[in-house]
Amino acid sequence: MLTRCRSGFTLAEVMIAVGLTAVVAGTLYRLLMTTQRTTRAQAQRVELQSNLRAGSLIVLSELRELSAAPGGSGARNDILVAGSTALVYRAMRGIGFVCGTPSATSIRITRGSFTGPRDPQADGDEALVFIEDSAAAGAEDIWLGMKIVSVATGASCPGALGPGITLTVPASPVVAGLEAGTPVRITEAMELRLYESEGRSWLGARSVSSGETIQPLVGPLTPGSGFRLEYLDAAGRPTTDRTSIKSIRVALQGTTQGGGTGDGPVEEELLAQVVLRNAIRP
């Protein structure tokens, strides 16, 4: 008589297989989640570092054009207000050269000689005119600041100099005596500062001249310390006298919007120092 053999697994074998499958699946799941968190944290860190680098390039490019004169005032100093987390300064927006003979209320600069990201703007920009050895200006070799009342582009410069940009300014006998080729700088009062919006800290910028609302440049930053400024004199010592500032140390400290591989957000800090225009380098 033949005996039928049944193939299969015992209950114990099935339970062992199910247990091993659960262990392997759990390990793979934890590995996947860890990899996902690590990748997300690395992406956030890269984004944060790129954000800080871009912000530092903007800040340094603005500050590099500034100048301060010991004991000077007015147009001789581009730093208007110097704070630890805020700075109001005269920003360079273009430069051109006088063509023809100005009147007491108008200056015409050659379009071909003007260099800048935009044309001069009325009721916001200021024209700094170089005055050399002028008794009427009350000093030698200064930049005389004048508010731009209006801007016109219809008139041309004399001879073959081509189109011009005519700036209407308050009447001044100094303007009428300007010679052709006199440099004219176009500036705008700007502010950089740390501010809070929607519960986060940002580095913002605004045009003080035109009364703009502050707009974010870089962020989110560390609350209270995300943007810090330290002002140094010619000897590299900290100074609170804005006329003695020769370089500015800038610190940007940012934070990721989400958590990293740990429990909290990731923070990064970028430090830089810029030497002001015309500062004597040791």
Task: Go through each PLM region and give its residues.
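Short coil-to-beta transition motif at edge beta-strands of beta-rich domains
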Residues: P120-D133
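Short, structured beta-strand/loop micro-motifs enriched in basic residues and often containing a Trp
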Residues: M92-S113
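Aliphatic-rich helix starts adjacent to a transmembrane/signal segment
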Residues: S7-L60, R64, T261
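Low-complexity, S/T/G/P-rich flexible repeat/linker segments used as non-globular hinges
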Residues: I131, A135-A155, G259-P282
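Short linear sequence signals and composition-biased patches located at protein termini or domain-edge surfaces
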Residues: E47, I186-E191, Y195-P282
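Alpha-helix exit/C-cap motif
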Residues: A54-A82, A86-L87, A91-G96, A137-G145
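Generic short beta-strand segments
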Residues: A91-G94, P170-V174, A251-Q257
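A generic structural motif
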Residues: L87, S106-G112, V151-P173
